[in-house]
Amino acid sequence: MSHTPSLPRRLVVLLGSAALIFAACGTAAPSGSTAVSQPPTTSVAPSVAPTDAEPYEGMAYPEADAPCGTAPYTGSLKKITATDRLTVEFQLCAPDPAFLPKVAFSVFGIWDSDYLAAHAPDKSYLTAPVGTGPYTVSQWDAGNRLVYTANPTYWGEPALTPNVEFRWSDEAAQRLLELQSGTVDGIDNPGADDIAAITGNAELKFNIREPLNTFYLGFNNTIKPWSNEKIRKAIAMGIDRERIVTNFYPEGSEVADYFTPCNVPFGCEGDATWGFDLDAAKALLAEGMAEEGITSISTELQFRAAVRGYLPDPPQIATEIAGQLSTNLGIETTLDLQESGAFLDANAAGTLDGIFLLGWGADYPDPTNFLDYHFGAGSGAKFGEPFPDVAAALQTGATSLDEATRQAAYVEANNLIKEHVPAVIVAHGASGTAFKADVTGSHASPLSNETFSVMQAGDRDTLVWMQNAEPLSLYCGDETDGESLRACEQVNEALYAYEIGGTEAIPGLATECVASDDASTWTCTLRDGVTFSDGADFDANDVVVSYAAMWDAEHPLHVGRSGAFEYWPGLWGGFLNPPPPAS
């Protein structure tokens, strides 16, 4: 059953001679080498000042409540309502102890609803975003650089450096060379062997990043032989994780005993994952192969070159793992290096058929961000079919406000994750950023969401930042890649934000969000006088439309880059009008 709202007046957008009417609002990098600039605003219905506006027509989505607990809907959101111009009400299917850090996440950034209606259908918003943030995009020269200019109408503190330029290289040595030569002002993820050179150079500064991440080896449990739990468990016992961390990770990194880092509340409840036990691994592998009627395993080790805090040297670590699988377990592998965007899309679609190297960096410090996204009911096809017992335990943890109940739920969930082995948990990697010493305000965020507007690049008018890869798009409602999220965060803002360089959720486009006594409803009061970079006024309908475009899989603005919108079901439990399961 579809849930479609009545149409508010301001979402009728004229494009040429045709009137396109949208109910409410619902990433590939640009393919050419031509610079992409901010689109003209003439195609967007002009906004009017609040004092001159017609009576405000707040909208609700969906018009009737979402069918909480009724298949096929598995989501946790019941309804979003613009009760007036500056108030939005979120009705939930069950309490959500992580509501505030969720709505602070940049994936849930707010867009001008008229702009979405005009530019989502043709996907032009992927490369030319509008937002309320401290910067606007002035140019995207595909394959080379992404340029930002300070937003002259920004409601908050103006950017200290007028321009920011993003560049990228997947080679740590190249990033360091650019920093040392002075062609860039800051870099992400210096190589483990380069940190000493940075800290020993008075002209540079290293900022350490807390290891709120996890590196893992994943399997699709619907594909043989990974459908056999004994084989998955044998690989978990047959990998020497200590050797990997010691040889390839920077100081401060840890062997991971749990999928969620221990500095996240409730992260390390229950039993630690399997340790290195070669004899037990060989015995289990033999049993599993006998059950499958096979005598050997040959597969691909699938990965991308993108450096991350959880994976500091992908080719070297992949080579090490391939060697261990061969030497320890007799599993022969072929290294399969894939393009980053295609790799992530294949992971989301559940089409990676080998052992894949991936990881996760925290978006907010709660187990729901790590566990629900990967193993919950709305986690999708990344690891094949979700395990119902794991999903049930996670549902309890995600919907209880009682700490003892949450703790017990995560004990159960972690024990079941250990037993089922959807992935081999390997490492929590330390990482950091490095800047020229004269860049004031430089920092490394534990969430990898560095805020460039608070940095002053000496006496220069442009701060040049070099990260690991090019963004996939600048509409992050349909992205999961950290390089894309960081790029979006300079332009788009969410209802809440995170403190600079930290993890605490603080007011953003909302001055406050307050829960009802039973925590079934959150009421958010919006900041008045905020405008988007296209000149449109920010109001409550923009919030409803921005969320609806992600929430409803049948929404006309549910477009994005790949169309996967992975974060929504991973963090909110499921889509409204979900697509049928893949055959």
Q: Model-found features: residue ranges?
A:
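Ligand-site clamp/hinge motif
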Residues: 105, 123, 151-197, 527, ...
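Aromatic- and charge-enriched surface segment that lines or borders ligand/interaction sites
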Residues: 44-57, 83, 89-91, 175-178, ...
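Ligand/substrate-recognition segments at binding pockets and active sites
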Residues: 286-362, 465-468
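N-terminal lobe/hinge region of extracytoplasmic solute-binding protein
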Residues: 128-132, 466-517
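Long beta-strand-rich cores associated with HINT superfamily self-processing modules
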Residues: 433-463
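Extracytoplasmic/peripheral linker and loop segments enriched in polar/acidic and small residues
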Residues: 49, 63-81, 245-246, 327, ...
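Surface-exposed binding/hinge segments that line
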Residues: 48-113, 525, 556-583
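Structural transition elements
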Residues: 254-288, 305-316, 452
